[in-house]
Amino acid sequence: MAILSLSAAGPAALATSADWTPPSAPRIVYAQGYYCLTLIVGVDRSTDDQTPQSQLTYDVFADGRRIGSMADLGSTSGVWSIQHLTHTGPNTITVKAVDAAGNRSAPSTGPSTTNVVTGYPC
């Protein structure tokens, strides 16, 4: 992307680089439902072409509905979070990495047994 600025002194070009590339899809390494609709989820850290890993965020979805987000706190064991499910019973969990430009990755990968958790009432 290039931006052209016109002034009395003549045109001046300002070159900028837009980030259109999404981060890599995270991989769910742990997802478990607990009582009172609590969800603990952990993912391996994603990578991005421009945003450092420490600045990526992760949106958490249950049955396609966003229920929260996680920040990368620099842990070597991945990114972990406690979220709250919206209903009891089976919930399909997916996670998407988001870079500083707002690009979202493809949905998380991982074994299907990891992605479906049960929400338990209080």
Language model regions located:
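Extracellular fibronectin type III
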Residues: 102-120
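Surface-exposed, short loops/turns at beta-strand junctions within beta-sandwich domains
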Residues: 81-90
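Conserved aromatic anchor
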Residues: 37-52
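Secretory targeting and sorting signals
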Residues: 1-15
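Short beta-strand elements bearing conserved aromatic residues within extracellular beta-rich modules
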Residues: 56-60
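Short beta-strand segments within Ig-like beta-sandwich modules, predominantly Fibronectin type-III
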Residues: 68-76
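Proline/serine/threonine-rich low-complexity linkers at boundaries of modular beta-sandwich domains
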Residues: 11-25
